[in-house]
Amino acid sequence: MKKLLKKLVVLFLSSLVIIFNVWYFIICAFSPEYYQNTNLTSNEIIRFEKLYHIDFPDETKFIKAREYLAGPGGDTSAVLYVSLPTKRVEKVLSDYTYMKINYTDNVGSMYGVDVSKSVAGLTTLTFGTYDKKGTFYNMKHDDDWMYKGTDWNLYFWTAASYNAVIFVFVLVIVKQMNKILN
């Protein structure tokens, strides 16, 4: 009976390790990879205006831009976050028909314009579309564009460290069980 209990505990803990590794791999493998810029140049703003078929007013504050390296179907996509005075949003979007407009606080759609609720007289607009022409993908990124994504070297060492800790934990449990059962 003691041997059966030991085997069941080891089997249970081993299955937890496997489940953890699969879960961690899926999280890392499917996390988005993108370049992000919070300091857009006037040339990049012009590229975004052409991509989204819009002319941003002078008081537009450009929060950040993201270029996702792989979107649905393998396309790249570009997402731009801007902030405007709430009074200007209606004028800007009144005749805008290029993309679907979503009035929501759930920012993050990869296609369309998300309009957030007004906070302190400012409204955040998120423009997202597929970058089929490679407007940004083919562009050489300068130092302002920071890569955000999975670093597989970091993934490997993090997973190895977690597994080592779990292995030590399993050894301690098995030794304690041996003391209790003997």
Swiss-Prot record:
It is found in: Membrane. Residues 1-29 form the signal peptide. The chain crosses the membrane at residues 152-174. One of its GO terms (cellular component) is membrane. Keywords: Membrane, Signal, Transmembrane, Transmembrane helix. Its main location: membrane. The keyword Signal applies. It comes from the Bacteria. It is a single-pass membrane protein. The keyword Transmembrane helix applies. This is Uncharacterized protein YkuH. It comes from Bacillus subtilis (strain 168). The lineage of its organism: Bacteria, Bacillati, Bacillota, Bacilli, Bacillales. The gene is ykuH.
